[in-house]
Amino acid sequence: KLQDDLPPVPFEKIRASIEASFEQPLEALWSEFDPVPIGAASIAQVHRATTTDGRQVAVKVLRPGVRERFARDIDTYEWAAAHLESFGVEAARLRPRLVIANFKRWTNRELDLRREAASASELAEHMVGTEGYEIPGIDWDRTNGRVMTVDWIDGIKISNTEALKAAGHDTDEIASRLVLAFLKQAIAAGFFHADMHQGNLFVKADGTIAAIDFGIMGRIDRRARMWLAEILYGLTTGNYRRVAEIHFEAQYVPSYHNVDEFATALRAVGEPMRGKPVSELSVGQMLDGLFAITRDFDMQTQPHLLLLQKTMVMVEGIATQLNPKINMWDVSAPYVRSWIRDELGPEAAIADRIREDTQTLLRIPELVRRIEDRFPPKGGAPELPPLPDVEL
């Protein structure tokens, strides 16, 4: 994560790494390359450069040896997680081994800059038509597993509220737009930027939010997104019974528990939050309440939702800094309600049925072939007899 807080790798090593990965001199790709990085972190560092055709770009380069160091570190994490699970039921419920397995997968993706570039490209496609939110373009000719080149972004860090106001930006509007952009990614696209901390978001001169650093991405399938949207909408409207039912339908709560009791537990956490700006809420108390619910109702950790939960906290923190009076529920509810209507309405149901029927029809020829392979038609080759066991 590029938080400008680690000493950079000497430029000689960075140059050598770039030239080895492209098998050509650095000057063949960039006419100018600033040897002083604009950001350095544990995994990579970023340099400003100008391509040979005159474009301003940012070049992200993996730290030499970072892949080998991570491979050593993850062995320690896996050992610790396995021992933690052996301590008892409460530790096993948190599924630390599965959490570490997901962390390993996420980080291995982050260590391949081609994957990061592909993620940025995919997210840009999902966000087409979203006003005021931008993903920098990828320079594929100057990108490989160890180096990624993207369009240069000029802007103010989203965390610098004073500079944003001095430049004439409406920080309240930016806060709402950031929340809606995240909801579009997570709920509509099912593919979201999972590293939306303050160092990875900028505001351009025209007010556009520009995101960078796509090494960590989250993906949610359509069914989980439907559950998520209904849960969010249920919490915003106080329909705790429906939220509880969804948790049971998704099998997040073991079936031997009572739906109504779970709904009451949710109400105890949700009601104090409704109608209040984030500045008046205690996130710590809310998380304590939710964690108590997971414990009391034997809910296992859902690793596929950990990234989503982490990102939601990040987005809420930034939005609150931009607009201390923002009410996340009020901003989210209209979008979530509209998405649910579009996805659950009659037109969507008909489209889903047509899609499912088409997929079934397309599978029929393959099913027939497999049946004939298992049960040949008359005159076909007979099935081979089983071979006897012979002791040698």
PLM region spans:
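Broad phosphate/nucleotide-binding scaffolds in NTP-utilizing and phosphate-metabolizing enzymes
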Residues: 1-190, 198, 202-392
